[in-house]
């Protein structure tokens, strides 16, 4: 087992995106049929390779999954093969350790229809998942709201609780029982899994029935079957609350240096949050502890080979030393092939030798390179991915209405002040644009840095009222002063001016400064603004253009590093600042009065600026909730439009903007708390995010291309064609002849047990226990079937000998029945 065998290499596809699975059999990797992906035996270990494609780049994740009843040898083999596969991929993969019952969201996300965990394993004769087999009796406990995992539990009412979904699988019939406290999404996921079992394992020849626990009387025949199989029910157990992970734990980062240079492994804490990339040395290995929730191991490319080889063991030893649960998730990161999730635990992440445009050497929170596309307004709706990267829904030529907050109310801004934004004010801007014949709206909420808290609160309140006036269709964009997005600037065609403070109100008594200095940034009408800075020489920068307005004249100061396009745009915006003739001043040739106006010469930034970074980021989607009174965000890996559920709210993080998507059936409290929830996300982000990051609220059905462009193949008609839980339940309810199925189940074959089976009245004669236990076949009484000794027992003797009722015994997999009979001398 020192290298990947030829069979594995032959079956290994490293160029096609998707999932490949192997099972450990006799210490070898054996490919699993794709028709059974999503089914795992708890007595086995598996290796799952996931390949992702971003642009032209491929990335790899290797997960090894440990069943709760697997052997130590199998677990060790899975870990070794994971390392060998990573070596085969030249260290480009992220390794994950997955333990049954505590699988990562990334792992669950590969199996959109759900995961089914079965009893048994290859060592006990369970070679594969049988299809088109109806000789089945099992109870599946379905857990999870989004990517579900269903595990076999004891086939008894004792296994049920009020808060979860259960599938009673009887071969020709699957009954889904929904706990009265389960939610619609959990029920829908359970139904999807039931249909998957029906279609994939039974060729569509199994009936599916649904019982809602709060209204069992509506399904009398299905309840009759359940009580027949499971026995009469007693009081149901209370709902088991889902595990809640505090955001503070996710943000609790500690970095440890790992070394064995002295002959023994030494783990030493070197830093806590916030973390910076320069803490990681290429010559060493590190452990990053995320509040005990997940352990990352980072392997420097020049680290000791033995240290790198032992990375996973180091993590497991660390977990033991910290007394964390054995099921704690572990990821091994290779130097240069880190996942986006790992990178975003750091304040800033540099990708060496990656350029996009002249002089750009790195991107924030990114591993993907995206080709820069020249702005073309006509492409925004045809190519929403371009709109997403450019952050533009169009070229800003739509209709505009602007209001200022005055006395906590909305007052229209006079035309002469349109484009002027004062730091002491808050503004609402409604932008209307067309896609085809349909009107769409953007509602910008601009909040000055010196505005009062009452005005900021009023701006949010007035935005809600305006939103309702337009039938909740506008996309709301919160813009803190200084964070103006490109599209907002494009509306003013290069004439946007932002003042440090003050107001444009007619009755203002605030004095206007006699000298003002504005820094101008931008190369076109779509990205230019002038931003007021302190009127002193230290504010200057050789890379930019500045407008200096005095009582007597207006200077246009051009730094040596500015371009011709920047000079042209500066002339345009300068006309907005002052109507007087502009005196162009080249850096180094300033007249004396220029320095007098700035209070005298002083040193200023004159080093050449690196090319402006265009952020190329890895977008991340989170399902959000505050139902427990605490903000929770669950990441959805490899997301697509199907992950956006109508009952929920979601957060799409594209680093320099945060979108908050609201489903039409979302909780009212969550709708109202959208902006607050997004701000809480930024505050609790492990990397220490800028709390002033713009927040954009998007409603289902009114998504702008700047949002849809982050999703592959967005379908605007998706929700109009989708089926609700009630629709699917109605369909399934019409599929079964329950009376015929009930008759078949209540008159089973002789070798099928249920809670009401009376063995003494069956076709087989009854004998005392001592005549059947540990007896060779030739010594058994006449009439005894040696392979069915347990069926010749009275119920009392059966329970005494096997330690369970016949119904519980019949619920066990055949391999477990056989093992138990051997153990008790009845085989």
From Swiss-Prot:
CDD domains: gelsolin_S1_like, gelsolin_S2_like, gelsolin_S3_like, gelsolin_S4_like, gelsolin_S5_like, gelsolin_S6_like. Gelsolin-like repeats lie at residues 28-107, 148-216, 269-342, 409-489, 528-595, 634-707. Phosphorylated on tyrosine residues by SRC. The unphosphorylated form increases the initial rate of actin-nucleating activity, whereas the tyrosine-phosphorylated form inhibits actin-nucleating activity, enhances actin-bundling activity and enhances actin-severing activity by reducing high Ca(2+) requirements. The tyrosine-phosphorylated form does not regulate actin-capping activity. Residues 138-146 are annotated as: LPA/PIP2-binding site 2. Its main location: cytoplasm. Keywords: Actin capping, Actin-binding, Apoptosis, Calcium, Cell projection, Cytoplasm, Cytoskeleton, Phosphoprotein, Repeat. Pfam families: Gelsolin, VHP. Residues 1-126 are annotated as: Necessary for homodimerization. Residues 1-734 are annotated as: Core. It is found in: Cytoplasm, Cytoskeleton; Cell projection, Lamellipodium; Cell projection, Ruffle; Cell projection, Microvillus. GO terms for molecular function: actin filament binding; calcium ion binding; cysteine-type endopeptidase inhibitor activity involved in apoptotic process; lysophosphatidic acid binding; phosphatidylinositol-4,5-bisphosphate binding; protein homodimerization activity. Residues 816-824 are annotated as: LPA/PIP2-binding site 3. Residues 761-827 form the HP domain. SUPFAM superfamilies: Actin depolymerizing proteins (SSF55753), C-terminal, gelsolin-like domain of Sec23/24 (SSF82754), VHP, Villin headpiece domain (SSF47050). The modification Phosphoserine is found at residues 366, 735. GO terms for biological process: actin filament capping; actin filament depolymerization; actin filament polymerization; actin filament severing; actin polymerization or depolymerization; apoptotic process; barbed-end actin filament capping; cellular response to epidermal growth factor stimulus. GO terms for cellular component: actin cytoskeleton; actin filament bundle; cytoplasm; filopodium; filopodium tip; lamellipodium; microvillus; ruffle. Residues 112-119 are annotated as: LPA/PIP2-binding site 1. Belongs to the villin/gelsolin family. Consists of a large core fragment in the N-terminal portion and a small headpiece (HP) in the C-terminal portion. The core fragment is necessary for both actin-nucleating and -severing activities, whereas the HP binds F-actin strongly in both the presence and absence of calcium and is necessary in actin-bundling activity. The Gelsolin-like 1 repeat is necessary for the actin-capping activity. The entire core fragment is necessary for the actin-severing activity. Epithelial cell-specific Ca(2+)-regulated actin-modifying protein that modulates the reorganization of microvillar actin filaments. Plays a role in the actin nucleation, actin filament bundle assembly, actin filament capping and severing. Binds phosphatidylinositol 4,5-bisphosphate (PIP2) and lysophosphatidic acid (LPA); binds LPA with higher affinity than PIP2. Binding to LPA increases its phosphorylation by SRC and inhibits all actin-modifying activities. Binding to PIP2 inhibits actin-capping and -severing activities but enhances actin-bundling activity. Monomer. Homodimer; homodimerization is necessary for actin-bundling. Associates with F-actin; phosphorylation at tyrosine residues decreases the association with F-actin. Interacts (phosphorylated at C-terminus tyrosine phosphorylation sites) with PLCG1 (via the SH2 domains). Interacts (phosphorylated form) with PLCG1; the interaction is enhanced by hepatocyte growth factor (HGF). This is Villin-1. It comes from Sus scrofa. The lineage of its organism: Eukaryota, Metazoa, Chordata, Craniata, Vertebrata.
């Amino acid at each position: 087992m020192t290298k990947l065998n030829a069979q594995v290499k032959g079956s290994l596809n490293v160029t096609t995106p998707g999932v490949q699975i192997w099972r450990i059999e006799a210490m070898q990797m054996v490919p699993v049929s794709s028709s059974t992906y999503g089914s795992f035996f708890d007595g086995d270990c598996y290796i799952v390779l996931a390949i992702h494609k971003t642009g032209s780049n491929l990335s790899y994740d290797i997960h090894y999954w440990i069943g709760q009843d697997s052997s130590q040898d199998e677990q060790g083999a899975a870990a070794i093969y994971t390392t060998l596969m990573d070596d085969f991929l030249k260290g480009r993969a992220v390794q994950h350790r997955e333990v049954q019952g505590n699988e990562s969201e990334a792992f669950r996300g590969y199996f959109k229809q759900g995961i089914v965990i079965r009893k048994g394993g290859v060592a006990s004769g369970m070679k594969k998942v049988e299809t088109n087999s109806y000789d089945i009796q099992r109870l599946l406990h379905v857990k999870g709201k989004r990517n579900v995992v269903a595990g076999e539990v004891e086939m008894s009412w004792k296994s049920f609780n009020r808060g979860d979904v259960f599938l009673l699988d009887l071969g020709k019939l699957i009954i889904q029982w929904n706990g009265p406290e389960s939610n619609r999404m959990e029920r829908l996921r359970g139904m999807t899994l039931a249909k998957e079992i029906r279609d994939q394992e039974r060729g569509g020849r199994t009936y599916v029935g649904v019982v809602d626990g709060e209204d069992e009387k509506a399904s009398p025949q299905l309840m009759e079957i359940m009580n027949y199989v499971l026995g009469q029910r007693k009081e149901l157990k209370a709902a088991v609350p889902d595990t809640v992970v505090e955001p503070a734990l996710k943000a609790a980062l500690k970095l440890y240096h790992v070394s064995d240079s002295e002959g023994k492994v030494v783990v030493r804490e070197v830093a806590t949050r916030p973390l910076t990339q320069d803490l990681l040395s290429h010559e060493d290995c590190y452990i990053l502890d995320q509040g005990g929730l997940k352990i990352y191991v980072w392997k420097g490319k020049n680290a000791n080979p033995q240290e790198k080889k032992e990375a996973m063991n180091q993590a497991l030893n660390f977990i033991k030393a910290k007394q964390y649960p054995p099921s704690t998730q572990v990821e091994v990161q290779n130097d240069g092939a880190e996942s986006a999730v790992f990178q975003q635990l750091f304040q800033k992440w540099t990708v060496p030798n990656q350029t996009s445009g002249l002089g750009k050497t790195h991107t924030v929170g990114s591993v993907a390179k995206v080709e820069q596309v020249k702005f073309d307004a006509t492409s925004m709706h045809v190519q929403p991915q371009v709109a997403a990267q450019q952050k533009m829904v169009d070229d800003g030529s739509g209709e505009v209405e602007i209001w200022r907050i005055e006395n906590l109310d909305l007052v229209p801004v006079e035309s002469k002040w349109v484009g002027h934004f004062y730091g002491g004010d808050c503004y609402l801007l409604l932008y209307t644009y067309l896609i085809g014949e349909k009107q769409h709206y953007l509602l910008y909420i601009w909040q000055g840095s010196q505005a009062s808290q009452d005005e900021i609160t009023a701006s949010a309140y007035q935005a809600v009222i305006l939103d309702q006036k337009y039938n909740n269709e506008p996309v709301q964009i919160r813009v803190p002063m200084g964070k103006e997005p490109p599209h907002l600037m494009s509306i003013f065609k290069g004439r946007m001016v932002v003042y440090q403070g003050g107001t444009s109100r007619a009755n203002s008594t605030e004095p206007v400064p006699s000298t003002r200095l504005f820094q101008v940034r931008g190369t076109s009408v779509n990205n230019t603004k002038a931003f007021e800075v302190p009127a002193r020489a230290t504010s200057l920068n050789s890379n930019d253009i500045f407008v200096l307005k005095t009582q007597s004249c207006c200077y246009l100061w051009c730094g040596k590093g500015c371009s011709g396009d920047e000079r042209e745009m500066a002339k345009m915006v300068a006309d907005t600042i002052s109507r007087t003739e502009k005196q162009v001043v080249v850096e180094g040739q300033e007249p004396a009065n220029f320095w007098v106006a700035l209070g005298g010469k002083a040193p200023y930034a004159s080093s050449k600026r690196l090319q402006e970074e265009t952020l190329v980021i890895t977008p991340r989607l989170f399902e959000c909730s505050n139902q427990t009174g605490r903000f929770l965000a669950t990441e959805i890996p490899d997301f697509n439009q199907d992950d956006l559920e109508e009952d929920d709210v979601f957060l799409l993080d594209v680093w320099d903007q945060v979108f908050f998507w609201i489903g039409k059936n979302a909780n009212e409290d969550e709708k109202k708390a959208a902006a607050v929830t997004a701000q809480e996300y930024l505050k609790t982000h492990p990397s220490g995010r800028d709390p002033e990051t713009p927040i954009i609220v998007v409603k289902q059905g009114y998504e702008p291309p700047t949002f849809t462009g982050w999703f592959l193949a967005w379908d605007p008609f998706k929700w109009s064609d989708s089926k609700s839980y009630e629709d699917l339940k109605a369909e399934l309810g019409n599929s079964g002849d329950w009376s015929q199925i009930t008759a078949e189940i209540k008159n089973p074959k002789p070798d099928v047990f249920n809670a009401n089976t009376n063995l003494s009245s069956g076709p087989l004669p009854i004998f005392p226990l001592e005549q059947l236990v540990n007896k060779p076949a030739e010594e058994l009484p006449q009439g005894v079937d040696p392979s069915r000794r347990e069926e010749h027992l009275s119920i009392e003797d059966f329970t005494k000998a096997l330690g369970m009722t016949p119904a519980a015994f019949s619920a066990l997999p055949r391999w477990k029945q056989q093992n138990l009979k051997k153990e008790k001398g009845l085989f």
